[in-house]
Amino acid sequence: MDTISGYLGTHHRRCDQLCIDAEKSVAAELWDRADAVFQEFCAALEQHFAMEEEVLFVAFEKAIHGTDGPTAIMRVEHNKINSVVFMLRDALARRAKNAFLGHADTLNIMIAQHNQVEDDIFYPMLDRMFGAQKHELIEAMRKIAESPAADPAT
Ligand SMILES: [Fe+2]
Ligand SMILES: [Fe+2]
């Protein structure tokens, strides 16, 4: 995967698929499977945000000499997404099927809007901006993706 768009776009789709699997498991009341898949989703999302916030956004902010551009908005959106994930985790722990599915609808809309801006505008812009240096950024992100995920319950 030799572009930021390709690498992170693929990761977006992986997160989406895990979220769909978790919803399907909850809808079918397959709770053990839902626990396992939701945990995998949380870990993937946490790694995704870490790749963006600790590598990509930092490189962008350094290049534009500022932190109050689009990355500030995206960091706020990550926090909002995380607060909905927290509600999903709580609903799952309570085996509250309808609450989980309701929060999942909200989450899907928030993530779709956020990812659309990244996929269509932000990542392609970074691919152009960083030229050959993008390979170093992808390598740094890959290291985060391959590191063991923190326990999402902590
Ligand atoms: Fe993001
Ligand atoms: Fe993203």
What are the roles of these predicted feature ranges?
Residues 1-154:
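Small-residue-biased structural context
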